[in-house]
């Protein structure tokens, strides 16, 4: 009878080192290649368009490719007033986006209803979908949107992306 010994290395950090490195690589790729989808619903959309001009250079943050198809984007920028009639469409578009997905609420109207406090206006998009970054202002300047992209990149950098991939695969 032949006995076989298996050599093992018992380390408290075994497995975590590789996962951490892979997480960092995945998060680096995600944060530097954001594909935003503009939901320009009011005057904030003009400032959103201005942020794509050469003066502000949104391409520095890897977000220059604006997609108008929810299946090809990972960041939704809700810019402007959201009415209850429009809310169903916004939620449906959000659900069509592939995971991982993030939302930027741009402007006072998208964040809190703004000056339109009426029966037909949703008082904040966060009542409908989860929001990751808020941009204040009426309308906010393009620099504020660029700052929101930086904040979103910092948030993406801290996520445990590989663990989330394993959970969604199970």
Curated annotation (Swiss-Prot):
SUPFAM superfamilies annotated for this entry? Answer: HydA/Nqo6-like (SSF56770)
The entry lists its GO molecular-function terms as:
4 iron, 4 sulfur cluster binding; iron ion binding; NADH dehydrogenase (ubiquinone) activity; NADH:ubiquinone reductase (non-electrogenic) activity; quinone binding
* EC number(s) given by UniProt: 7.1.1.-
The superkingdom listed in its UniProt entry is Bacteria
Q: Which GO terms describe its cellular component?
A: plasma membrane; respiratory chain complex I
Q: What is its main location?
A: membrane
Binding annotation for [4Fe-4S] cluster:
43-44, 109, 138
Keyword check for Ligase, yes or no: no
Top EC class of this enzyme? translocase
Q: How many and how are cofactors bound here?
A: Binds 1 [4Fe-4S] cluster.
Needed co-factor(s): [4Fe-4S] cluster
Q: Name one GO biological process term.
A: aerobic respiration
UniProt-annotated location(s):
Cell inner membrane
Which membrane topology term applies here? Answer: Peripheral membrane protein
Keywords of this protein's UniProt record, alphabetized? Answer: 4Fe-4S, Cell inner membrane, Cell membrane, Iron, Iron-sulfur, Membrane, Metal-binding, NAD, Quinone, Translocase, Transport, Ubiquinone
- Give me the reactions it catalyses: a quinone + NADH + 5 H(+)(in) = a quinol + NAD(+) + 4 H(+)(out)
**NCBIfam families, per the entry:** nuoB_fam (TIGR01957), PRK06411.1 (NF005012), PRK14815.1 (NF011390)
Outline the subunit composition: NDH-1 is composed of 14 different subunits. Subunits NuoB, C, D, E, F, and G constitute the peripheral sector of the complex.
Q: What is known about what this protein does?
A: NDH-1 shuttles electrons from NADH, via FMN and iron-sulfur (Fe-S) centers, to quinones in the respiratory chain. The immediate electron acceptor for the enzyme in this species is believed to be ubiquinone. Couples the redox reaction to proton translocation (for every two electrons transferred, four hydrogen ions are translocated across the cytoplasmic membrane), and thus conserves the redox energy in a proton gradient.
Q: Which family does it belong to?
A: Belongs to the complex I 20 kDa subunit family.
The protein's name in its UniProt record: NADH-quinone oxidoreductase subunit B
């Amino acid at each position: 009878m032949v006995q076989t010994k298996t050599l093992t290395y018992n380390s408290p950090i075994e497995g975590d080192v590789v996962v951490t490195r892979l997480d960092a690589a995945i998060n680096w790729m995600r944060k530097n290649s954001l594909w935003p989808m503009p939901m320009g619903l009011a005057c904030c959309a003009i400032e959103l368009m201005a942020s794509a001009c050469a003066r502000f250079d949104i391409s520095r943050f890897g977000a220059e490719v604006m997609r108008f198809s929810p299946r090809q984007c990972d960041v939704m920028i809700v810019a402007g007033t959201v009415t209850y009639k429009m809310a169903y469409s916004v939620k449906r578009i959000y659900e069509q986006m592939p995971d991982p997905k993030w939302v930027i609420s741009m402007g006072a109207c998208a964040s809190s209803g703004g000056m339109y406090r009426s029966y037909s206006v949703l008082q904040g998009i966060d009542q409908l979908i989860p929001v990751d970054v808020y941009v204040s202002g009426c309308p906010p300047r393009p620099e504020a949107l660029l700052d929101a992209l930086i904040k979103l990149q910092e948030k993406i950098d801290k996520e445990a992306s590989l663990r989330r991939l394993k959970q969604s695969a199970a």
